[in-house]
UniProtKB/Swiss-Prot annotation:
36-chain polymer consisting of 6 hexamers, each of which includes 4 different chains, A, B, C and D. Belongs to the tyrosinase family. Hemocyanin subfamily. The lineage of its organism: Eukaryota, Metazoa, Ecdysozoa, Arthropoda, Myriapoda. The gene is HCC. It comes from Scutigera coleoptrata (House centipede). This is Hemocyanin subunit C. Cu cation B binds at H358, H362, H398. Disulfide bonds join C568-C616.
């Protein structure tokens, strides 16, 4: 099912059958050699967060010592933060050394040498980037951050229970020995209602791995230029924010407030209760009411200045390049360039002038408890890519960042009818329904599900035996979109885009479509043949090109079959917001355009992320859709409601999302006993 789900969309970029075969052979290797490589990769990373064996001996003579100079700048006990630019030079050097290895065996030998010299987390990040981007490792499974650092995702009480059992030497054969399904409900903190979302293992792992697929430190000298990387930064984080808003509204909470003033107290406190057992690093608690403070080399005023420069360039239409020239951002590439500026990645037009707004805000927020290092306090979760999305402040900050992108989008003209409708074909959406597996038409049920996370043997807290941890997450029933489309011309290929958004705002009022578009979540994107006359298209929720399967999160990675997966994508069990017991009305929107008009022409030489192409793009791959991400809801809409805005190739339906409150056991739960 997983391979079929993306074939329809991935095929957009494949020009001829021979090319398709070549790419598949390159990216989807299942032979014995690839299995050997995967075992070697897993062997390298397996010891990153574990004590090094006293018998280990690093290879000698595989790399000149002078090439290793400068490595080890970041101390081993510290957290590696991709947000902290001070780490970028060392991380970039490690990535380059790993990519420059002449063949796979040399790559493994170089990795064995480097991992002893550098910070463990920095090595894991650089090694993962290299595995994803080397030609001789594409298509292989990349180690998942939660497999290597489960203590970044499991709270201290769970880790301590694992440690107690391990110290007793008890052996349990595939039994979930630790129950971590308790979700707190602290009525003193409204955000505790969102713990199931904020602290979800798959969500936070996705955020980390997305930054592996699209590294801020990537430059064209390392390989092919990343296609639409800046736009992906905008769109993926915009979608994380929109999904967070839907979860808040499902729980009767107002949308999150935008971060606005650097001198205002932050009302939301956050206590992560996570620490790294091997090093003792404990993520700092942020009490409510704290105010962001200057760092020794980074005053808040610098952040304000960078933001003003970006906004001035947006409103004036003139951007300053590092070579001293000025230029206007065009409609097609403007959002991509702006994304690189705001992130700010090494491909920013002018990092000296526009600075590093997004990343350094994470650093300032992460060091709020001890900005000068006076008390030796560890940083908070906002400092770490793997943990930052746990904090409600993450979404307030990204709403601020998203507003900058919307300032740019608001300078673009609304789409015309001609731009919204196919020019060489006539499609009419005549009806849409959503059919749940067990519920009434246009109703989708959600519930809790337990899943088993394997914690491997050899950690400080699992020295003697592996363990299973039972975790609790949201889940929804399978459902099918049924879309009736009339094609009034010859046989064509339709390009389907599906979005969803809450029907009412937090006051119970119908949205102005221009406000509703800002919280649209992308549900799916795919192509389908449309024959003359009426066509009934059925699309299953499991096939979404937005999501990665829960098996990619919870299954033993060594047992997964490599299908060119990037382990990137939104967790499939979070595709639908929680909803509520009464029924949370969501509007599902569909637009059908002509694939021939939207496809990207030209050969491609890389691999796509087959598990979630829409959110993650590809490795060395052109994104196979020339339309802006979020089309047709990415630009301002002057009409008041959807009915006034829509064209004949669009439609919508209201769907009730009902939370049942039930809890479903893992599919293989009984097999563990």
């Amino acid at each position: 099912m997983g391979a079929w789900k993306v074939w329809t969309f991935f095929a957009i970029a494949l020009v001829v059958a021979v090319k398709a075969y070549d790419e598949e052979a390159k990216c989807m290797s299942h032979d014995e050699d690839s299995q050997v490589k995967e075992r070697q990769i897993l062997h390298i990373v397996d010891s990153i967060n574990k004590p090094i064996s006293p018998d280990f001996r690093a290879p000698r003579g595989v790399i000149d010592e002078h090439k290793l100079r400068g490595l080890g700048t970041l101390k081993k006990r510290e957290i590696f933060s991709l947000f902290d630019e001070r780490n970028w030079d060392e991380a970039s050097k490690v990535v380059r050394l790993l990519l420059d290895a002449k063949d796979f065996d040399d790559f493994i030998d170089v990795a064995e040498v480097i991992r002893l010299r550098v910070n463990e987390e920095l090595f894991l990040y650089a090694f993962s980037v290299a595995v994803m981007h080397r030609g001789d490792t594409q298509g292989l499974q990349v180690p998942r951050i939660h497999d290597i650092f489960p203590d970044k995702f499991l709270k201290e009480d769970v880790i301590h229970r694992l440690l107690e059992l391990s110290n007793r030497g008890e052996h349990y054969d595939r039994i979930p020995i630790i129950d971590a399904t308790q979700i707190s409900h602290n009525y003193l903190d409204p955000n505790s209602e969102l713990e199931y979302f904020l602290e979800d293992l798959g969500l936070n792992s996705h955020h980390h791995h997305w930054h592996v697929i699209h590294p801020a430190i990537w430059v064209s000298e390392l390989g092919n230029e990343k296609d639409r990387k800046g736009e992906f930064f905008y769109w993926m984080h915009h979608q994380m924010l929109a999904r967070y808003e839907a979860e808040r509204m499902s729980n009767g909470l107002a949308r999150t407030r935008t971060f606005q003033n650097w001198n205002d107290p932050i009302d939301e406190g956050y206590a992560p209760h996570i620490s790294i057992m091997k090093t003792g690093y404990t993520y700092a608690y942020r009490p409510p009411g704290y105010t962001l403070r200057d760092l020794p080399n980074l005053p808040k005023n610098k952040m304000v200045e960078w933001a003003k420069r970006v906004l001035y360039s947006i409103h004036s239409g003139i951007f300053h390049f590092s070579n001293g020239t000025d230029a206007h951002l065009d409609t097609e590439h403007g959002i991509d360039e702006l994304g690189n500026i705001v992130e700010s990645s090494l491909t920013s037009l002018n990092r000296d002038y526009y600075g590093n707004l997004h990343c350094y805000a994470h650093v300032i927020a992460g060091r709020i408890a001890d900005p000068e290092g006076k008390y030796g306090e560890d940083n908070g979760v906002m400092y770490d890519v793997a943990t930052s999305a746990r904090d409600p402040l993450f979404y307030r900050w990204h709403k601020y960042i998203d507003n900058i992108f919307q300032e740019y989008k608001n300078t673009l003209p609304p789409y015309t009818t001609e731009e919204l409708t196919p020019q060489n074909s006539e499609f009419r959406v005549q009806g849409i329904s959503v059919v749940g597996e067990t519920s009434a038409r246009d109703t989708v049920h959600t519930y809790w599900q337990h899943s088993l996370l394997k914690v491997g043997q050899g950690f400080e807290f699992t020295k003697h035996t592996p363990a299973y941890v039972k975790v609790k997450h949201l889940q929804h029933e399978s459902f099918t979109y049924v879309i009736d489309v009339e094609n009034r011309g010859r046989t064509r290929t339709g390009f389907f885009r599906i979005f969803a958004a809450p029907k009412y705002n937090e006051l119970g009022q119908k949205w102005h479509i221009n406000d509703q578009r800002l919280i649209m979540v992308e549900m799916d994107k795919f192509i389908e043949k449309l024959y003359p006359g009426k066509n009934t298209i059925e699309r299953h929720s499991e096939d979404s090109t937005v999501t990665m399967s829960s098996a990619s999160i919870f299954s033993d990675i060594s047992s997964e079959q490599s299908e060119d997966h990037c382990s990137c994508g939104w967790p499939d069990y979070l595709l639908v917001p929680k909803g509520n017991f009464e029924g949370f009305p969501m509007e599902v929107f569909v637009i059908v355009t002509d694939y021939e008009e939207d496809k990207v022409e030209g050969p491609d030489e890389g691999c796509a992320c087959h598990d979630a192409l829409t959110y993650c793009g590809g490795i060395d791959y052109h994104f196979p859709d020339k339309r802006a991400m979020g089309f047709p809801f990415d630009r301002p809409i002057k009409q008041r409601n959807f009915n006034a805005f829509k064209t004949k190739n669009m439609g919508k339906v209201t769907v009730d999302v009902k939370f049942t409150g039930e809890t479903i056991a893992p599919e293989d739960f009984h097999n563990q006993h």
